[in-house]
Amino acid sequence: MNYKVVATSKDTKARAGVIGTDHGEIQTPIFMPVGTVGAVKAVHMHELRDDIKAQIILGNTYHLYLRPGMDIIERAGGLHKFNTWDKPILTDSGGFQVFSLSSNRKLKEEGAAFRSHIDGSKHLFTPEKVVDIQRSIGSDIMMALDEYPPGTSDYQYAEKSLRLTQRWLKRGWDHFNATSPRYGHSQAFFPIVQGCVYKDLRTDSAKFVADLGAEGNAIGGLAVGEPTEAMYDMIEVVNEILPEDKPRYLMGVGTPANILEAIDRGVDMMDCVMPTRNGRNGMLFTQHGIMNMRNKKWADDFSPLQEDGASIVDKIYSKAYVRHLFVAQEILAMQIASVHNLAFYLWLVGEARKHIIEGDFKSWKTEMVERVTRRL
């Protein structure tokens, strides 16, 4: 993997770049749709490629390890062949899912022991095993195993958690460098900065991560209950330390406004389930504001879903029709909303990139943040 900065904003920390992988280039800043179990919910691969114009998607180590399992994925020739996605894939290490989904989890120096949320079976994720699983998946970018403390953790717990994450990181990095890809394409390993909302812990973690010399770096443990301004402060602290010649990935964030503010602070890559999850519940994000498609106000609005929208569904379906589908609990409503929201998110980061290159990102971002947070 390689990364090149092609333009920077004179008034902010925003930058436009290109990540090169064996499965193609990624124009940054970029939003990555979440395909937890190897599929983005309610969206076909051809829609991701051709309509949404996704450049990279996510898979999740925890979920794919439990189901369908590594034997199936290996026999398929890796996740790219299994799900027919021929562009880059990033896999999360599964750490967040271990702590949020599984029962009877137990942290120890060796790794994270847990029971499957599917059948209650016992498992152990070690830093080394998580690398091996991601080798079997064949993702272009894999993540290090980390502990995922709540954003409201006290200082003592946050520091203890960070030290464990750092020890795990060293083991995972060593194992990554001692092993090879399985399917003939290169894989990158991203360490994760943790430290909750404590500036000294975030600084310590960012320095530790930067010194590792990985091909890219991630910022984790944010948007988990802390105030929004605290999240932005931590991004600023970390990005002052992380190297400028490596891509920076902010994990699990967020709203359109969050994404623009993260880009403003030097973030290159973002993912979140919000566009699909909220879409399935009738919330549409647009460049003019947020629409609740269950509201009665749309019942007789026969205008296109979004006349200047980024996807084909915006132009061929009316607001009244989509509202009817949601009220009738028709599955098609979820599909339309998911395609719309993802296409909007990809449009948004594409516009951010354009304005970084053109030199007017700051003024554009200020106006856009105000617009995308309106309730229509």
Model-derived regions, located:
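Glycine-rich phosphate/ribose-binding loops and adjacent secondary-structure elements
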Residues: R163-Q166, T179, S186-L305
